[in-house]
């Protein structure tokens, strides 16, 4: 199938078809450009959306690290990566499809113009040959008519008896001249005819088929280029599918990481005050005086009245605690956090101690480095003056002493808080025990007996030195609340941390309080803190 043989007489239609092909190419290029702009705008809008909803937190922000919030932030990160992949798609389409198709469109326009010009030039040359042949044909026809007239004139004069010999001779010469001119025009016409036939054969069997062949090849290349662009368009999407799939998988994993129990525990850690709920108001039996008067005719004052709690004191204490369920009174922030509830105060003090400990470790490391540098300078004076390090060493020493004093002061406050919490718990258990004993000794009349010795046995005995209790408590290890598997190795160089290897299984004895550290225990009983992000935790289900 060839345009040169099948469409030898369809030059105008082929010209229109090739122009339509170029117009369609430009139309597809416009489509790709608009598709490219859509991808760019989509990626830009996604990035703006992520930027809008990403947390803008300062270094001092103490936003609770809820798993639902962390999951959402991870989803935003994955969405940001997804937007980056849309930008990659736009870039691929721009370079591999749009730029290529625009370059090819310009090339094919020039090539088409050249082929059509060659076809028109061949047609013009054939038309010129036809015109020359037609002119020679008319001349030959005219000369033949003139020769025929000359022959008729000669024959008429030759048969005329009245004609002179000179007239006959003159007519004869004219006949020979016209006959000669007719022969020459005949030869010229024959030559022009032969030439035109040859050029026409060459035109329709060689020149035009060659031109049409080039046009056909050009149009087929245009079709192939469109096919390649279609495929490149799809390949640009296909290349990013694996990464987009990872982004979507990351979103799914972020959704699975939401732990409602952990979020509930974070709420407890953030807002737990450490206070005990208000106690019950005691029943004050004013009728017992009436019953005693009716039964024995006397009015007596109960001996256990001194054991009754003062209603005014009870109400006062209750009112002092009821702010937990209402609006918390605001007060100035104190250095020892005494304006905070006990549990929050303990947490803030522990955080400050941890921060001061890290600063202390940095200062000690800096002091060690300065001392080593000083030793090097003393051994090699050409490297530096040891005396130049004395101010810096003195400053570091002063900072170390200051930090140690701060840590000691905060540890004292922390011990005070923990002691108060422990005493409050003991008083609660003591009150419960007294309440049970008092119920056992209550008389049917609503009065109390005077068994003071029994009350003495029920009262719990408090240690004079509560710090001894802490020492005994440390001997008994904390119970494990779950286990974990280390995902990465951790050297545990800092004080209080626990070194672990990758894949090592540990017991969890204390959950992350929101500072990024989890307390764990090894199989050999060694305890310490490990980074929460380095382990995979499995907590025991609470019965």
UniProtKB/Swiss-Prot annotation:
General function of this protein: Required to coordinate membrane tubulation with reorganization of the actin cytoskeleton during endocytosis. Essential for autophagy of intracellular bacterial pathogens. Promotes cdc42-induced actin polymerization by activating the wasl-waspip complex, the predominant form of wasl/n-wasp in cells.
Site (Mediates end-to-end attachment of dimers): 165
GO molecular function: lipid binding
Pfam family, one: SH3_1
Biological process annotations from GO: autophagy; endocytosis; signal transduction
Protein name as annotated: Formin-binding protein 1-like
Subunit: Homodimerizes, the dimers can polymerize end-to-end to form filamentous structures. Interacts with GTP-bound cdc42 and wasl/n-wasp.
Domain notes: The F-BAR domain binds the phospholipid membrane with its concave surface. The end-to-end polymerization of dimers of these domains provides a curved surface that fits best membranes with around 600 A diameter, and may drive tubulation.
Membrane topology note: Peripheral membrane protein
InterPro entries linked: AH/BAR_dom_sf, F_BAR, FCH_dom, FNBP1L_F-BAR, FNBP1L_SH3, HR1_rho-bd, SH3-like_dom_sf, SH3_domain
Domain SH3 residue range list: 479-540
Coiled-coil segments: 66-258, 334-426
Protein family according to the UniProt entry: Belongs to the FNBP1 family.
Keywords: Autophagy, Cell membrane, Coiled coil, Cytoplasm, Cytoplasmic vesicle, Cytoskeleton, Endocytosis, Lipid-binding, Membrane, SH3 domain
Annotated compartments: Cytoplasm; Cytoplasm, Cytoskeleton; Cytoplasm, Cell cortex; Cytoplasmic vesicle
Name of encoding gene: fnbp1l
Chief location: cytoplasm
Superkingdom classification of source: Eukaryota
Record domain REM-1: where: 339-416
Chain segments carrying region Disordered: 424-467
Record-level GO cellular component terms: cell cortex; cytoplasmic vesicle; cytoskeleton; plasma membrane
Domain F-BAR intervals: 1-263
């Amino acid at each position: 199938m060839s345009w040169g043989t099948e469409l030898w007489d369809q030059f105008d239609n082929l010209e229109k078809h090739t122009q339509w092909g170029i117009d369609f190419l430009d139309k597809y290029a416009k489509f790709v450009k608009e598709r490219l702009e859509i991808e760019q705008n989509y990626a830009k809008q996604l990035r703006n959306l992520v930027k809008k909803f990403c947390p803008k937190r300062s270094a001092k922000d103490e936003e609770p690290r809820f798993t639902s919030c962390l999951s959402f932030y991870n989803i935003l990160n994955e969405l940001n990566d997804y937007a980056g992949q849309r930008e990659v798609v736009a870039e691929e389409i721009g370079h591999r499809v749009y730029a290529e198709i625009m370059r090819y469109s310009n090339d094919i326009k020039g090539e088409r113009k050249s082929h059509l010009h060659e076809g028109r030039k061949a047609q013009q040359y054939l038309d010129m040959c036809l015109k020359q042949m037609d002119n020679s044909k008319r001349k030959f026809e005219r000369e033949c008519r003139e020769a025929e007239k000359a022959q008729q004139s000669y024959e008429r004069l030759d048969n005329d008896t009245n004609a002179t010999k000179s007239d006959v001779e003159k007519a004869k010469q004219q006949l020979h001249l016209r006959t000669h001119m007719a022969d020459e025009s005949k030869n010229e016409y024959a030559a022009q005819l032969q030439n035109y036939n040859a050029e026409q054969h060459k035109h329709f069997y060689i020149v035009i088929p060659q031109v049409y062949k080039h046009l056909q090849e050009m149009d087929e290349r245009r079709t192939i280029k469109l096919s390649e662009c279609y495929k490149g368009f799809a390949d640009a999407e296909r290349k990013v599918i694996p990464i987009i799939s990872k982004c979507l998988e990351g979103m799914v994993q972020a959704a699975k990481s939401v732990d409602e129990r952990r979020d509930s525990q974070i709420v407890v850690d953030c807002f737990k005050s450490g206070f005990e709920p208000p106690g019950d108001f005691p029943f004050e039996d004013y009728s017992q005086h009436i019953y005693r008067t009716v039964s024995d005719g006397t009015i007596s004052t109960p001996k256990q009245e001194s054991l009754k709690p003062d209603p005014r004191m009870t109400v006062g204490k209750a009112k002092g605690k009821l702010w937990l369920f209402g609006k918390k009174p605001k007060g100035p922030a104190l250095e020892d956090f005494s304006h905070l509830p006990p549990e929050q105060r303990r947490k803030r003090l522990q955080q400050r101690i941890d921060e001061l400990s890290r600063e202390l470790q940095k200062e000690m490391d800096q002091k060690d480095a300065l001392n080593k540098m000083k030793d090097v300078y003393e051994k090699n004076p050409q490297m530096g003056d040891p005396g130049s390090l004395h101010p810096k060493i003195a400053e570091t020493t002063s900072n170390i002493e200051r930090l140690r004093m701060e840590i000691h002061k905060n540890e004292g406050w922390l011990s005070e808080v923990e002691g108060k919490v422990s005493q409050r718990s003991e008083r609660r258990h003591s009150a419960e025990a007294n309440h049970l004993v008092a119920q056992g000794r209550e008389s049917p009349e609503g009065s109390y007996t005077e068994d003071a010795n029994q009350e003495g046995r029920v009262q719990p005995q408090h240690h004079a030195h509560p710090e001894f209790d802490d020492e005994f408590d440390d001997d008994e290890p904390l119970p494990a609340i779950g286990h974990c598997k280390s995902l990465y190795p951790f050297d545990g160089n800092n004080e209080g941390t626990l070194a672990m290897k990758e894949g090592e299984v540990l017991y969890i004895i204390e959950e992350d309080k929101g500072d990024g550290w989890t307390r764990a225990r090894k199989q050999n009983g060694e305890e310490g803190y490990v980074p929460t992000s380095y382990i995979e935790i499995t907590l025991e289900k609470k019965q």
